[in-house]
């Protein structure tokens, strides 16, 4: 009689990290794209130094506050990673919400800055300014969408409660329309 079982169970495979590796590759591509835009901006500015920003000025208050919002967003998103690793869902949701608020603040400040600067595409610096800042705006917006997607993925453990909640919200929308709006 042998003490070794007839069949040994297969070992548990390590968790794959395709999302992490994919995000790393996309981040590298985004960085290369953004660096090329900044390089084009700097090359054009060096070539047209005497006419660059002669008609417009860019205030520093909004870019400084945008940077502060992004730094705070980085702190908050790291807090969310810490909370998710320790199964602290409440803290994770709070941290992701704070990150989303900081991203929204950044996007709001960017649009305010664009309006305040009032640069046109006909000016020498206009296309380059909007290409660099617009690409950054788009990537921060995509990051915000990614954060929100990850926040909803954390609800996977409670689908029945979430479904029940959403159905009741939809039912209240019908009641709201029929009873309070249409009277």
Segments (PLM) and residue ranges:
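...captures the hydrophobic TM-helix bundle architecture rather than a specific catalytic motif
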Residues: 1-183
